[in-house]
Every structure is written in C-alpha cells, then in structure tokens.
Amino acid sequence: MDFWLYKQAQQNGHHIAITDGQESYTYQNLYCEASLLAKRLKAYQQSRVGLYIDNSIQSIILIHACWLANIEIAMINTRLTPNEMKNQMRSIDVQLIFCTLPLELRGFQIVSLDDIEFAGTDITMNGLLDNTMDIQYDTSNETVVPKESPSNILNTSFNLDDIASIMFTSGTTGPQKAVPQTFRNHYASAIGCKESLGFDRDTNWLSVLPIYHISGLSVLLRAVIEGFTVRIVDKFNAEQILTIIKNERITHISLVPQTLNWLMQQGLHEPYNLQKILLGGAKLSATLIETALQYNLPIYNSFGMTETCSQFLTATPEMLHARPDTVGMPSANVDVKIKNPNKEGHGELMIKGANVMNGYLYPTDLTGTFENGYFNTGDIAEIDHEGYVMIYDRRKDLIISGGENIYPYQIETVAKQFPGISDAVCVGHPDDTWGQVPKLYFVSESDISKAQLIAYLSQHLAKYKVPKHFEKVDTLPYTSTGKLQRNKLYRG
C-alpha cells in the first residue's frame, strides 16, 4: 500500500494538512519536509527509536519522516520521570531518542530535531512524487538540489502489518505493557471512527490531546488517511481553545470530560461550527451530559484503549439522551461480547477486530490476553437488549485521572519501600476536577506525615501519579485466601 502521506501529496496536495495558527503546511509541503528529514534519519541506521515530542508541526513532520524511513516510533509520555522513561525504552531495546523538547537521559543517544539540518527552500515536488529523485544539500548556497540517485530512494509503499508505533499502557515500576500498533491497526481504527463518528476532507479537527497518547496520535492518522486538516495546539487553555473554535471554523475536537467542562465554563454555550465533540479518557457525569446537551453541543462519548488504537465504542448525542451511562455501540468493523456474564449481564468485555494489537512486545510471556481471537479488555461491562454498551469498571483497579491511566500497583510498590510502611494500597478517590485522583492507604507503626510521603513518592513517580490523599489504617482488608478487597476501600 502507498504511504498515506505520499498518496495525499499526489491527490490532495494543495489541501492544508496541518496548521498551528501561525504556520500551515499543505499535504505536498508536509510530504516534502518529511521526505527530506527521512533521508537524514536513515543515516542513524535505527529500526526503532523513541520520540520525546510536543504537539507541534515539527513533531508531526518527524513522525511521518520516521515512517517514510521505515523506523518504528516508541512514544514517550513527557510527564514521566527519567527512570520511568529509561525502563520503558530499555524494555523494547530503544537506544536512540529523537526529541522536539529538551531532554537529558543517561544511557541513550539523544538527538534534537533542531540539530538535524533538513529544511528545504524552493524544491519542486515532481521528483519526490514520481519517486525518481534524491534530495541532496548544496552547502555552497544552502539550497536543496534534486538529483537522480536510485540508490537512496525512499520507499513510497509499506506493509500494513509492519509496526508503526509503540505505546505503553502503564508506568514502569509496576507491570508495564508495551503495545505494538501496526499500520493495519491504525487504518482499521480510522475506518471504524469514520463510520461511527463521521469525518471527511472538509473536516477541520482541533487536536490538543498529547500526540504521545493514542487519542492524540489517532487524529493524525485519521487526517492523513482521509485528507483533512488538523489544527494542532500544544497546551490546553480554555480561553484560547474557545477563541479558536469561534474564529477558525473548527468542525471536530477531541477532549476529556474535564476540558469540556472548562470550555463550557469559559462560554462554550453553542456549537458554532462544531459538528463532533469526541469525548474519552474518563467517565462522563450525568450533569456534564445534561449541560452539554442543553447547549446543543454535539457530544460523542467513546471508549477505547491503547491496545485497540483508540475508540471502538461510540455514543451519539441521541444515545446519550436515551442512556447517559452508555459508551455507545461498537464500530461496524469490530465485534464485542461479554465473557461469563452474571445474572445482571455484567461480565468482562471482549473485542475482536483489525484495530486490535496482535500481542504485547513486553512482557512477552503474558497469558490470557486473547481467547478465541477476542482480546480480553479486563473491563467489566454490559450490553443491553438494544446493543448499548455500559462500562462499569475500567479494569477495576485502574485509576483514570484527567485522561491519564494510573496503575495502583506502581504506587503501592514504591510506597512499601518507604521506611516504616509495612503494607499499602492505592485506590481512586473521587475528584471534581480530574474525575479521580490516587488515594493511598498505608499500615505503619510510625508517625509518618503527608509531606514526608509526598516528598518520597515524588522522587520515584510522575507528578500526576503521586497520591493526593493519604490515610493511615491498622490493617487492610484481605479475604481468607489473602486477596485484597479493594472494593472496601472505595469510599469518599
């Protein structure tokens, strides 16, 4: 199959691919810049690299350049601690990291995009698009000179089953999982999203979710597959986002529930040109749904995972009006079912489809991931008689705070290393701003202050993973067989 960017440059070349409000690149511009950079990246002779990047045009050029150079990209969450980053990259044998942000990480070759000279001036697209020319630099006048050189021609096609990206589902002190996402996975996800949500070449999608998350990267894949425009924003600011929505004819936007709430507080009381507001990353409250629908905002609730290359369940405004607790129905190209439902119809959600990963890169010895071709999500769900899916527990122990997945095991492991703590458990605590925040229960015979615990945990965990609430207890609730009863700790 032809690279999607190559195809768009040929067929949709003058359409705006990406803009940050100051600078815009057509699909031809984007392909040209990515091709130039790809040739530079080939010199590093790496088949897999880490990316430490922001939401910027340069980061998007870098992503496409890696793919044109047949390099797999491992996305690094920029909020992680250095040790967390090291452990993730080492687990998948990454030695080199390209970055668009300052980074110091011992034991790795760090290459800033600013240090790679690749930007051209006035280069014709003809040679690139018919794949007959190489690009070389004439250092005497700092211009780019097309030159026939078949030995260094970039591939314009790719294998759908090659790995495109790698993302991690959790931190690294606890059980981490490296998810390989193939081009086929991304393509199937994009097609499913198009059918269940809807977009076309006239779409103008505002993307503010981090590119290192599947929710951010998936927007870029949908764009290059379909040929629409992405308005990239690096940081969320409600006033700025609302201004962009009003003034730049934004048709689509991806948000987590709290950011939608902030936008409504800022004055998003009508849809303007918005056709679709795609929500995910945390449960929607009934109040948020009611308020948004009163403003006639086109909200679409969704559910997806890193392992499924973003959403595979989508709820339309009509569905949310009928059942506010639903995450909707599955995309047409996936199949879902409930494993071992109880008398209430609740059981583990299983999914099968081309959007689902083939298996984890790390650890390699996991069992029970798939059953008869269905991926075991670990989420407790129900499918009602109309086909609506309700998610009751997102992997039960998982804490979802502001769209970030936090695994209690990682926090507990670090906490138990604190002098004087004999046992600890972390659960999600309700929070008006973030949905949930971590709360740590610990057993100790010593007097340990909250400040001491925060200082210690902050040395080992990313800031958003550090518990916001602490409670000292005499014992933790275990069953007679030694199983921790976390449900007894879920209280306000």
Curated annotation (Swiss-Prot):
TM ranges: none
Instruction: Give the protein name, as stated in the record.
Output: 2-succinylbenzoate--CoA ligase
Q: What class of enzyme is it?
A: ligase
Q: What is its EC number?
A: 6.2.1.26
Any GO BP: menaquinone biosynthetic process
**MF annotations from Gene Ontology:** ATP binding; o-succinylbenzoate-CoA ligase activity
Q: Which UniProt keywords apply?
A: ATP-binding, Ligase, Menaquinone biosynthesis, Nucleotide-binding
Give the UniProt family note.
Answer: Belongs to the ATP-dependent AMP-binding enzyme family. MenE subfamily.
Short name of one Pfam family:
AMP-binding
| PANTHER family from the UniProt entry | LONG-CHAIN-FATTY-ACID--COA LIGASE (PTHR43767), NONRIBOSOMAL PEPTIDE SYNTHASE PES1 (EUROFUNG)-RELATED (PTHR43767:SF1)
Q: What's the source species for this entry?
A: Staphylococcus aureus (strain MSSA476)
Catalytic activity entry: 2-succinylbenzoate + ATP + CoA = 2-succinylbenzoyl-CoA + AMP + diphosphate
Q: Which Gene3D superfamilies match?
A: 3.30.300.30, N-terminal domain of ligase-like
| Its biological purpose | Converts 2-succinylbenzoate (OSB) to 2-succinylbenzoyl-CoA (OSB-CoA).
Matching entries from InterPro entries are given as: AMP-bd_C, AMP-bd_C_sf, AMP-dep_synth/lig_dom, ANL_N_sf, ATP-dep_AMP-bd_enzyme, MenE
Protein's UniProt keywords contain Nucleotide-binding: yes
The cross-references to NCBIfam families, in alphabetical order and at most eight, read: menE (TIGR01923)
